Swiss-Prot record:
Gene name per UniProt: hemA
Signal peptide per UniProt: none
Residues that coordinate or bind substrate: T49, C50, N51, R52, S109, E114, P115, Q116, Q120
InterPro entries, sorted: 4pyrrol_synth_GluRdtase, 4pyrrol_synth_GluRdtase_dimer, 4pyrrol_synth_GluRdtase_N, GluRdtase_CS, GluRdtase_dimer_dom_sf, GluRdtase_N_sf, NAD(P)-bd_dom_sf, Shikm_DH/Glu-tRNA_Rdtase
Name of the protein: Glutamyl-tRNA reductase
Native organism: Desulfatibacillum aliphaticivorans
Subunit note: Homodimer.
Amino acid sequence: MDIVLVGLNHKTAPVDIRECFAFDSLEADAGLKELSRIPELTEAVLISTCNRVEIAAACQDPDEGIAAIKDFFSRTKSMPLENFEQNLFVYKGDEAVQHVFRVASSLDSMVLGEPQILGQMKESYRLATQAKTTGAVLNRLMHRCFMTAKRVRKETGIGDHAVSISYAAVELARKIFGELTDKKVLLIGAGEMAELAVEHLLNHRAAGVFVANRTFERAVALAERFRGTPIRLEEVEEHLKIADIIISSTGAPGYVLEKKDVKKVLRARKNRPLFFIDIAVPRDIDPAINNLSNNFVYDIDDLQGVIDRNIDERQKEAVRAERIVDENVIKYRTWLEGLDIVPTIVSLQKKLEAIRQAEMAKSLANIPEIDEKGREAIERLTQSIINKVMHDPIQFLKAGGHREKQKKEVLGFTRDIFNLNNPQNGDEFTPDEE
């Protein structure tokens, strides 16, 4: 049994190709049912997100399994293989396992360390188990992959550093204020990044939001969304006295707030820090405000600089994460290789147990005077002998199982020397008459 993986992602395929291969939940369910009917695949999991579509499968012949998955993509998406084969990546064995673990640990994501991918993979696994397309091999793979991702999150700082403008703004605010629980936010203007920054601040328990906009109707709508208070642009200066964090994104041709505007409220603020996040281009906030005591202005370039430094930090943490991934690849491979020897070990155990039971019955029949205590002693003695006899063959099989080229020979030799292919083994074993 081996693991194969075939797929495409943001690194290998443009968005127009990726969107052709995306599976929604209904399509994924139908796709899994189709995968279950492919004889070359023993088990399968379909992973589909906005940035990747991949199929991990267990199969007896890796090359046949890979070809079957390529054909599945071509048939289900009605696209000739030659139109997309150059966009596919193909892994087998340890490389396939490593890829699954790296994806779950967010080492293969567009944004290194982003947390969403693990939840998406758990959902993919849930759909596969629901469709009954997984068994012992992929169940073990996915559980180990989730454990690996959890260790990466716990033992490294790969997700600790903000790598988006909105998160970087929150990170800076926390450095200035510490806890944000009593801090008030003033949003001037609108825009996706500014609104996301407000959402993140509220998620960190900021005390409330004032919303000012060029049109008061828009301010009312945004305030309702954030459960805040709408104000008119003319009221912004007055609210500088009570706000702690100013987020501005108006797109106005000149500064919305100048140094003189802030200087007017310094006495009323009693030296409390004021943090400005200027996401507008051209800028809304006069950079000269930085020269005022306890006033901090960060524009889009400053925030990007924070992100660049944080990406470097995540890259350093990724080195530690890769080590955790590689460690778990080895552990999974050891388990998978041992899987092939289990039937032989079970057959050997059944044969020896049948011999033990038969010889016990014959011997005890010749000593009818033996009491229950004596029977238990003989039971323990014979069981101990069987366990000791089994020890060396099991260790031999496990050692041989690590060498792929010798595995079949080792298993065949063991079955021959113990005559395990004899249909009279196990429960039907009959000892030779003396």
